[in-house]
Each structure stands twice: as C-alpha cells, then as structure tokens.
C-alpha cells in the first residue's frame, strides 16, 4: 500500500510523525505537509504565489507556506511517484467534530485526496497525549482496507478519544453533530497601542446526542463519520423554487 500522508499541524507535529512511523511498518509512506501550523485553513489553495518544497533526510517533504490542500495537490500530481493508493491526513492535535469539519485543514487534506480520485481518511485525536492510540486505530483500519476495499466514494472522518488503547471501547459509525455559534473575539494591544484581534475558541456542543460524533468520543468510542462534498441542500430545492414563483423573481426585473 502506498500512502500519501499530510496534515494541518505542520510536518514536525507529533501526530503526523507518530502516524508515519507506525504506517511505515507495513506501507510505503510519503509525507507531504505544511512547514508550519495551518490549522483552520480549510480547503484553501495557494493561487497568487509559487510554492517551494524542502525535503528532509528521511524523505519527508515540507511545503513552505503551503496549505494542507496544496500539500495533497502537489503530493498527488508531482511529488509522489508512483501515485498513492490512499490519502491519509493526521493525526490532528485536537478533535474535528461536528461543525469543525467546515474549517478543518485536516479534513480538507482528505477532501482534496478524494477530489483527486483517491480513498481518503482524516484522523484526529481528542487531545494531545495518546497519539499512539490514534496511530494504532488508523493502522487497523488501513490494514482492513487492504484486505477489503471500502468503495463508498466518501471520506472517513475518524476521531479517537485521548485514551490508552486498552481503554477504547470500540468504533461507532456516526453523523456530524453541531456546535453553538462561536462568538468570542479576544482583543489585545500591540506595543504601539494598535488593537489586535484573536479568533476565540469554537462554540460549545449543541447537537451532541446519541448517534453523533461528539457522543461517541465522549463515551470512549472511536467515531467514524462518512463525509461527502456535495453541499447541495436537495430538500430545499423545491422550497426555493416555490418561493421564487410566489414572489415573482425571475419573471420581472
């Protein structure tokens, strides 16, 4: 199995390094990751400037100022030859649950892999300690995929409780929960008296009941949520169409 491995925490982050070491025991792994933390970069691409890369002695490649999506795009289309069999993103430091998937560079890297035609996993740890647990879970899933491919055409968003492996209760297939809107902005002043702003933490849990990714992780289970990129609200198409007809928009300007 050939694996393109990326993340949004940066090429030196403990999550990606722990996972790369574990994966290399049974797979051919090419790390292509940002040279710095790009958390929250979502699916952004660098279009207004060129991208430079740096290759370390162990073969890992850092993309200077690159986004997670840049890294996967370059990895698939230029840097990994032969091309990978699968794209894996992670292990993220902290969860990507519910609405987090909209902003997550970890999930975005997996989405880019899927967009380019490859199976893809996004892996996150609900904390900053037991990366070895998340690596073991990921390796188990990838070994299973080697034996029997999962042809859903979907991204698997995997969130792992920050627990020792022997305390993980199992795996649940879940849906994305939701968070309350984030509303905190943290102002500071620079030495010249100018105001600076920091984006605050994400909103608290809103829909976090049974069946959600939040609930699974809180209860000690690995959460696997299949994701797709069709953002069309199909059930709303008729509502919008009826509304346009009723108000006359499009029949006269």
Swiss-Prot record:
Gene3D superfamilies: Survival protein SurE-like phosphatase/nucleotidase. A divalent metal cation binds at residues 8-9, 39, 92. The keyword Hydrolase applies. Binds 1 divalent metal cation per subunit. It catalyses: a ribonucleoside 5'-phosphate + H2O = a ribonucleoside + phosphate; a ribonucleoside 3'-phosphate + H2O = a ribonucleoside + phosphate; [phosphate](n) + H2O = [phosphate](n-1) + phosphate + H(+). Its cofactor is a divalent metal cation. Its EC number is 3.1.3.5, 3.1.3.6, 3.6.1.11. GO terms for molecular function: 3'-nucleotidase activity; 5'-nucleotidase activity; exopolyphosphatase activity; metal ion binding; nucleotide binding. Its main location: cytoplasm. One of its GO terms (cellular component) is cytoplasm. Coiled coil: none annotated. It is found in: Cytoplasm. Pfam families: SurE (PF01975). Keywords: Cytoplasm, Hydrolase, Metal-binding, Nucleotide-binding. HAMAP family: SurE. PANTHER family: 5'-NUCLEOTIDASE SURE, 5'_3'-NUCLEOTIDASE SURE. Belongs to the SurE nucleotidase family. Nucleotidase with a broad substrate specificity as it can dephosphorylate various ribo- and deoxyribonucleoside 5'-monophosphates and ribonucleoside 3'-monophosphates with highest affinity to 3'-AMP. Also hydrolyzes polyphosphate (exopolyphosphatase activity) with the preference for short-chain-length substrates (P20-25). Might be involved in the regulation of dNTP and NTP pools, and in the turnover of 3'-mononucleotides produced by numerous intracellular RNases (T1, T2, and F) during the degradation of various RNAs. This is 5'/3'-nucleotidase SurE. It comes from Escherichia coli O7:K1 (strain IAI39 / ExPEC).
């Amino acid at each position: 199995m050939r694996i393109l491995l990326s993340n949004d925490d940066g090429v030196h982050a403990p999550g990606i390094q722990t996972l790369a070491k574990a994966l290399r025991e049974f797979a051919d792994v090419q790390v292509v990751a940002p040279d710095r933390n790009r958390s929250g970069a979502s699916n952004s691409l660098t279009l207004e400037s060129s991208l430079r890369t740096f290759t370390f002695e162990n073969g890992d490649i850092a993309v200077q100022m690159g986004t997670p999506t840049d890294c996967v795009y370059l990895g698939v289309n230029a840097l990994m030859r032969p091309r990978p069999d699968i794209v894996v993103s992670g292990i993220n430091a902290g969860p990507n649950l519910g609405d987090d998937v909209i902003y997550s560079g970890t999930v975005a890297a997996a989405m880019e892999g899927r967009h380019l035609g490859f199976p893809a996993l996004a892996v996150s740890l609900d904390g900053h300690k037991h990366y070895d647990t998340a690596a073991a879970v990921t390796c188990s899933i990838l070994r299973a995929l080697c034996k029997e491919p999962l042809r859903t055409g979907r991204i698997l968003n995997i969130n792992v409780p920050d627990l020792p492996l022997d305390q993980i209760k199992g795996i649940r297939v879940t849906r994305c929960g939701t968070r309350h809107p984030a509303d905190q902005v943290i102002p500071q002043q620079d030495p010249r008296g100018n105001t600076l702003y920091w984006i605050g933490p994400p909103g608290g849990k809103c829909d976090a009941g049974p069946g959600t990714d939040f609930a699974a992780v809180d209860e000690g289970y690995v959460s696997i949520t299949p994701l797709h990129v069709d953002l069309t609200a199909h059930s709303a198409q008729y509502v919008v169409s009826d509304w346009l007809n009723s108000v006359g928009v499009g029949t006269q300007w």
